[in-house]
Swiss-Prot record:
Disulfide bonds: none annotated. NCBIfam families: maf (TIGR00172). This is dTTP/UTP pyrophosphatase. Signal peptide: none annotated.
Length: 201
């Protein structure tokens, strides 16, 4: 079986991949995440997921892997009114994002890409998240927690921001950062089964 590498520094993605029982090695693959002119959110996250997988594959030396390695890349974007909300630059940016999301529905696009050196397959998952109204005081308190700093859209659905979520249509795990169902399907296409750590009965 081909060894699997996760080209991501995200603890959330590592947890989700561990959850489906797939052994992997995490590597960091930094790429330029600047959106291209007139690039749709779906095309943007797919390009970045593929780029991260390719960058990760470039970091693996032949001595590290006797079998051809598979590299999984992923990217998530929060989108409001067609505009991609990245990671907040500072407190003012984070508070502005939270107040813009307050009481409204927004889109979350997450892409995954799996590359083995010969082929690359990818998937894009779109989810809708609806926030209840958020007061400026709540937004400031949430910022002070430190949680929004490195999150797309300035919030973590699996963390303290769960109290803001009034509804979700789509994949919860995709909003967190890795669509588990689609990831398992893609891994299967490359001969990597899930639940490898289950005890034999």
């Amino acid at each position: 079986m081909n060894p699997l590498y996760l080209a991501s520094g995200s603890p959330r993605r590592r947890e989700l991949l561990t959850q489906i029982g797939v052994p992997f090695t995490a590597i960091s693959a930094d790429i330029d995440e600047t959106p291209l002119a007139d690039e749709s959110p779906a095309a943007y996250v797919e390009r970045l997921a593929r780029g991260k997988a390719a960058a990760g594959r470039g970091l693996i030396t032949s001595s590290e892997s006797q079998a051809p390695a598979c590299v999984l890349g992923a990217d998530t974007a929060v989108v409001l009114d067609g505009r991609i909300l990245g990671k907040p630059l500072d407190q003012a940016d984070a508070l502005q994002m939270l107040m813009a999301l307050s009481g409204r529905e927004h889109e979350v696009f997450t892409a995954i890409a799996l590359l083995d050196g010969e082929r690359c397959e990818s998937r894009v998952v779109r989810s809708l998240v609806r926030f209840r109204p958020i007061s400026p005081a709540e937004a400031a308190l949430y910022w002070a927690s430190g949680e929004p700093c490195d999150k797309a859209g300035g919030y973590a659905i699996q963390g303290l921001a769960a109290v803001f979520v009034a509804g979700l249509n789509g994949s919860y795990s995709a909003v967190v950062g890795l669509p588990v169902c689609e990831t398992a399907e893609l891994l299967g296409h490359f001969g990597i089964p899930c639940w490898q750590n289950l005890p034999v009965r």
